[in-house]
């Protein structure tokens, strides 16, 4: 079942009666080719000042493993067919080429396809074109951009400040590069759990620093994210809805409790004495405006944060009330399920925990990530909620759940290979189901669920419509700031800190950034992929209004509608930019001579399909009534439809 297509009355009702659009300088935009009165488009800005670029090397999927992936996809379909028969479910028809190409671009690349990509795919008669397109999308930059947004929501990635005066950019960059190089998921997670050092020296340490000073909460978050299990209630008392006891929670937390995240200013590493106080005293001599901290805290405090083993031992709380322990009793590390973790002499218990959690023998590690990614593609997990597995949790299809878990292990936690398998199933390639599944409802996956795009997918789709090369812009690499912020407090001086601070604030760096961003800027908005914008964006930004999370809690992004979203779509700068003369949409439309061809470009660009006869007639009527302005009205109408905003 497809989303209802735009009716004649809906198109006319949505169409504006004003001009095609007006630039901020008041120049009317005209679509007529060859019109001698058309003003030349404004000159492009000068190229930006050269600044360091982050090298992007995207690891492609291997063509040699495609046959096995297709065989696994067929196995998935066989298990689903048996489930359909068991529950007397009729699967949805196969999605049209137009529906499939739009869906797979959104799911894997995080954006709608261009109209040329739609046309090429639909016109292609190759029987393997779907499998080849899946491989292509998994091998391009859009994949890492898309799944960076996914992990940013789960890992609560923040560019600006990870924790007290510690920037998150190196950690965010490490996550992105892990996706680009297709680092196996078990290695990705192990790298975060076992990391040591400052975020500048070992960016993966950002995971532990994210919950600095909260070791018990950190354990709860880790088990929830990577093992799909919520044990947080047992932090204060025996879990009321699961089998975990408070003591078991503390035994798990004992693995990582001896991990420090901040050195004391008087740490022996700094040679004795309070190094921060000493530097602050010296700063008063160097900078007469020094007020004790402020902008200098990113040097003085930020460089105290370092993941290290401090040997601290965890004890039960002072008010512990159960018979299996005593208040303030020392707790030894012990796993709550699966095989025990082997703590070797002389090795941090945290390393044993990291090995145990990421082991293929861990009963919930592979199951959790396979279930999470299934939900990413189908709109619902085989087990719901995906982060609250219990011993008695019943998968919708136990045999399929077990097979997908085993496949994750077989492909050695290669997430691209796993996604390749699922996307090649007949089940994924069926029409979407327009059903609202609430907790407790049975859903047997006759097709993927119809769902609204994420905030990042909406934003990136607008960028694809407006910008010629949406993946071209890369965020400034972390090393630009690293060479200035990363200092050894034991060896530095107030003068060095002062000079580094001056350089960070210098007009040269500011001008370089402004020049770099200028070609991608429009009315205060940076027109680049969401993954290349600061994360998260401020509350008033388009992304936040469409549900991007504030990165304060795990997975709190939203696809719910709101009045601010309607206002953004009706009259926001992101909508107006589509009608600017340098917009890719305008260029593509004006490249066609006939109004009929132009209408097809508009529909295929925005909805990835040609207009119906009724829609074509409505569009022609609008253009006839308002001349060239009518084309802009049609564009405006289509981006304001549910069909544009939903993944079907």
State where each predicted segment sits.
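N-terminal secretory signal peptides that target proteins for export/translocation
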Residues: 1-3
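Intrinsically disordered, low-complexity acidic Ser/Thr-rich regulatory segments
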Residues: 339-343, 501-546, 550
């Amino acid at each position: 079942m497809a989303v209802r297509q735009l009716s004649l009355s809906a198109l006319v009702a949505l169409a504006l009666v004003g001009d095609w659009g007006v630039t901020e300088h008041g120049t009317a935009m005209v679509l007529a080719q060859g019109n001698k009165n058309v003003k030349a488009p404004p000159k492009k800005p000068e190229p930006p000042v050269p600044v360091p670029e982050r090298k992007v090397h995207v690891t492609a999927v291997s063509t040699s493993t495609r046959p096995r992936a297709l065989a696994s996809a067929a196995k998935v379909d066989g298990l689903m067919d048996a489930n359909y028969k068991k529950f007397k479910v009729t699967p949805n028809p196969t999605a049209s080429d137009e529906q499939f190409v739009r869906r797979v671009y959104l799911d894997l690349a995080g954006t709608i396809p261009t109209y040329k990509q739609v046309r090429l795919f639909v016109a292609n008669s190759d029987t393997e074109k779907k499998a080849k397109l899946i491989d292509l999308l998994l091998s391009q930059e859009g994949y890492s951009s898309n799944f960076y947004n996914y992990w940013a929501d789960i890992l609560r990635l923040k560019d600006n400040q990870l924790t007290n005066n510690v920037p998150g950019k190196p950690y965010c960059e490490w996550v992105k590069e892990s996706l680009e190089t297709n680092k196996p998921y078990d290695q990705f997670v192990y790298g975060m759990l076992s990391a040591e050092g400052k975020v500048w020296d070992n960016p993966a340490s950002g995971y532990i620093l994210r919950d600095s000073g909260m070791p018990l909460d950190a354990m709860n978050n880790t088990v929830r994210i990577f093992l799909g299990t919520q044990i947080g209630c047992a932090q204060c008392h025996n879990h009321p809805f699961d089998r975990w006891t408070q003591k078991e929670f503390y035994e798990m937390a004992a693995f990582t409790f001896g991990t420090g995240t901040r050195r004391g200013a008087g740490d022996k590493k700094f040679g004795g004495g309070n190094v921060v106080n000493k530097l602050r005293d010296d700063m008063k001599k160097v900078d007469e405006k020094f007020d004790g901290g402020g902008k200098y805290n990113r040097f003085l405090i930020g460089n105290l944060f370092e993941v290290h083993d401090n040997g601290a031992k965890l004890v039960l709380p002072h008010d512990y009330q159960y018979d299996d322990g005593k208040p303030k009793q020392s707790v030894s590390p012990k796993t709550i399920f699966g095989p025990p973790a082997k703590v070797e002499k002389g090795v941090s218990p945290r390393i044993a925990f990291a090995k145990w959690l990421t082991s293929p023998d861990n009963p919930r590690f592979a199951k959790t990530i396979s279930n999470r990614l299934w939900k990413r593609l189908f709109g619902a997990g085989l087990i719901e909620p995906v982060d609250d597995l219990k011993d008695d949790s019943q998968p919708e299809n136990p045999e399929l759940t077990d097979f997908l878990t085993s496949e994750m292990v077989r492909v050695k936690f290669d997430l691209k290979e796993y996604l390749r398998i699922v996307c090649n199933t007949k089940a994924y390639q069926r029409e979407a189901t327009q059903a609202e599944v609430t907790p407790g409802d049975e859903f047997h996956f006759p097709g993927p669920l119809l769902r609204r795009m994420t905030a990042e997918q909406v934003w990136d789709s607008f960028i694809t419509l407006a910008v010629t090369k949406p993946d071209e812009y890369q965020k400034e690499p972390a090393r630009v700031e690293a060479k200035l912020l990363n200092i050894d407090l034991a060896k530095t001086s107030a003068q060095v800190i002062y000079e580094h601070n001056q350089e960070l604030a210098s007009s040269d760096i500011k001008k370089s950034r402004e020049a770099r961003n200028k070609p991608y800027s429009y009315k205060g908005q940076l027109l680049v992929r969401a993954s290349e914008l600061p994360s998260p964006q401020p509350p008033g930004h388009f992304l936040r209004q469409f549900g991007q999370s504030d990165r304060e809690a795990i997975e709190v992004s939203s696809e719910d509608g709101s009045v601010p979203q309607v206002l953004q779509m009706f009259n926001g700068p992101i909508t107006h930019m589509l009608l600017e003369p340098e917009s890719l949409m305008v260029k593509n439309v004006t490249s066609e001579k006939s109004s009929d061809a132009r209408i097809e470009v508009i529909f295929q660009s925005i909805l990835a399909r040609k207009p119906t006869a009724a829609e074509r007639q409505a569009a022609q009527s609008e253009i006839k009534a308002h001349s060239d302005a009518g084309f802009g009205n049609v564009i405006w109408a289509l981006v304001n439809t549910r069909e544009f905003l939903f993944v079907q």
